[in-house]
Amino acid sequence: MSKLLILLLLSLVASIFSTPLDDYVNAPDDTYKWTLNNTIEYETFTGYILELTSQTWMAEKSDWPVWKHWVSICVPKGVTTTTTFIYVDGGSNDNWKVPGSMDQTIEIVCLSSGSVSVGLTQIPNQPIIFNNDGVQRFEDDLVAYTWRQFLGNTSEPLWLARLPMTKAVVKCMDAVQEFGKTIGYNSENFVIAGASKRGWTTWLAGVVDPRIIAIVPIVMPILNMIPNMGHQFYAYGEWSFALNDYTGQGVMDYLNGPQMVELAAIVDPFSYRDRYTMPIYAIASSDDEFFLPDSPQFFWNNLTATPEKHLRIVPNAEHSLMGHQIDIILSIVTFVRLLITNQPRPTFTWDITYSEDLNSGTIVLTVPEGGIIPYKVKVWTAVTESTTRRDFRIITCMDITKCIQFIIWDPSDITPTSTGVYSITLSKPDAGWRAFFLEAEYLYAKNSIDDEYTLKFTSEVAIVPNTLPFGSCSEYNACGDGSQGDSASSTATL
């Protein structure tokens, strides 16, 4: 068979299995360009600031169609690896000016990992006014609005903001590679990380570009999004305040409808699970106001194409991970160092089982024979403050002065029951629900930033009793199938 015929067949197969996300990301865009706007010399690294124009999106319906980003590149002295780390971040289009310094996160990763490290900002570009409605939309308000536009007319997938957000990451990689050639550095491949909406973008970037060899999605355990989102109502009897932008746009009126299935086919990373053939280090928070601590149950075991996957639940942390940033950064640094030096990463499996009456649960963590034994293993446990809601959130409403729950996750060291096997069984509390998970910590060489490099992986979360206090959102008219219009309420009648 000729090479030309093989290429044609491969192209045909790719087109058959492509989605609107693939099509948008791969579409040529003459808007793309970059310029070097600043060079900053430091003793241990050189910083470069690029102004990147990634694309034009929704030109006829947006007041900000041309997307621009600041790209900060940290090149450590004597860099030897050709793997580049990119952290996808947010930002605002307002007060557009050249950054005068490197982002601290990028600097830490750069110096601690020894790799070229990049900060990509303005994902998404914001604020944006759509359809001349005069409303400046940021973050979830922006994303929810674009969802609602698509749900109302699924023939227009370009409305979905996740498409340009993902393409911006791809164009950032293009710019970094092109710029690297001007300074004698070759970025062959990339590790991508990002949090929240940028975490979702990290998931999707990993499936559209083969240059990405590992991803670190942070506080975005959204995969299998339809049942994952619906699970929240079973636990709370209402939608979390964190979803106000989505309920306000009437998105939940489509949760069980064919339109949401079409949306998920484009933007739900679960739809692309067979493409996750690279290492994944997924980081989530125990008290997230967007997600539940057991959200990974909806997708983790289904990532069967992934050769290496690691989960970390951060205890006593809400969605912003306030107070935990340095610990998380250093854990990511260790993961990146092990990747770029081709060293083995720790692995283990876990199994969660419940008693017949669902009132007690057991987690067994097993290190494979010959595997790396953790420095220590802890069990983290917490009990809900509410006795009617299975609710582990720290913050339960927009006004945090009125709705703080004192959910405290307590650690206890546990010893192995045999070599590399750790087991814990806990029972339900006198009232409410108890959640628990196992955390394995690994210790590596010292560095100039911290005493040691630490790497933390965890099991999923078990909750006892293994029961949910409410029915589905549809039972309470809090979601719909897309046929009744924007009419659903947001709260169960208690």
Swiss-Prot record:
The family database entries (SUPFAM superfamilies) matched by this protein are listed as: alpha/beta-Hydrolases
Key word Cell wall biogenesis/degradation present in the record? no
Where on this protein are sugars attached?
Answer: N37, N153, N302
Instruction: List, in alphabetical order, the GO biological process terms annotated in this UniProt record.
Output: negative chemotaxis; negative regulation of aggregate size involved in sorocarp development; negative regulation of asexual reproduction; negative regulation of Ras protein signal transduction; protein localization to plasma membrane; sporulation resulting in formation of a cellular spore
Induction comment: Up-regulated by phagocytic stimuli.
| Superkingdom in the source lineage | Eukaryota
Q: Which InterPro entries match?
A: AB_hydrolase_fold, PhoPQ-act_pathogen-rel_PqaA
Q: Name one GO molecular function term.
A: chemorepellent activity
- What is the annotated signal peptide range for this record? 1-18
Q: In a knockout, what does one observe?
A: Cells proliferate more rapidly than wild type cells and exhibit supernumerary centrosomes and a cytokinesis defect. They also produce fewer spores at culmination.
Q: Name one GO cellular component term.
A: protein-containing complex
Q: Which UniProt keywords apply?
A: Cell cycle, Glycoprotein, Secreted, Signal
Job of this protein: Inhibitor that slows proliferation of secreting cells (also known as chalone). May function by binding to cell surface receptors. Requires cfaD for activity. Overexpression slows proliferation.
Similarity-based family = Belongs to the pqaA family.
Assembly and binders? Interacts with cfaD.
What this protein is called in its record is Autocrine proliferation repressor protein A
Task: Say which species the protein is native to.
Answer: Dictyostelium discoideum
